Amino acid sequence: MHDILDLDRYPLDQPGSEGYATLVERCRRALDTDGLFNLDGLVRESVLDGIVAEVAPYLRDYAFTHSRRHNIYFLPEVDGLPRSHPALTEFDTVNHTVCADQIPESMVCRIYEWPPLAAFLADVMEKPVLYTMADPLARANVMAYHDGEALNWHFDRSEFTTTLLLQAPDAGGDFQYRQGLRSDSDPNYDGVANLLEGRDRAVTTLPLAPGTLNVFKGKNTAHRVTPVEGDRDRIIAVFSYYEDAGVMFSEAER
């Protein structure tokens, strides 16, 4: 894995070492403060073109085009909110997805399945263990966003999301988030409305370079990817890890 990942800078394969402990502590602090952490340049720049070249034919010829109009909650309605409430404003999300079962021998899947990565994430999250997902489709996806396409405002349903940016677009495709917009006890619908209507000045734009692993707690932090601009796609891998072994999605969840 040393030929793919910069394990000199990020010693994920050396648990118990001082460098590993320092990295885990740094990532924990970032999660507590910012709700996310990045391992910038985890994937070596020298192999990024090769990774993209592996998945590009599948994205071109076999990707599933996911096009959906949705609100920030991914729900048809929210108890106590009229349909006209601005917190239920709808947006379009479009991307093109290749699933792990289509690229089982790819470097993307090798990275996802590499045991030290899941062990490192578990240490940062202070969990006993994290497992790769058993679902052959949902465990790891590669998504492409073409010119004009975006992942619009939403809250995540899972505790955390792990992504690996493989290719940045010519312009646009920026990751934006609004930390602490709601809590488990306060949905803050008026605050959500302010965000969606463009009045929230606390939105953060996070520049991500190809090769960056990003771990993000998005359950109560609204986030989006702005529309891509230009002929160069935004290509990103999404990795799913769980505290329970053998997790599968239902047909409806897929």
What are these regions (language model features)?
Residues 41, 218-219:
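Conserved "cap/hinge" positions at secondary-structure junctions
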Residues 43-44, 50-54, 58, 82-135:
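Signature of the catalytic double-stranded beta-helix
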Residues 56-67:
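Cytochrome P450 catalytic domain signature, combining two hallmark sequence patches
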Residues 161-164, 215, 231-246:
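A short hydrophobic beta-strand segment most commonly corresponding to one strand
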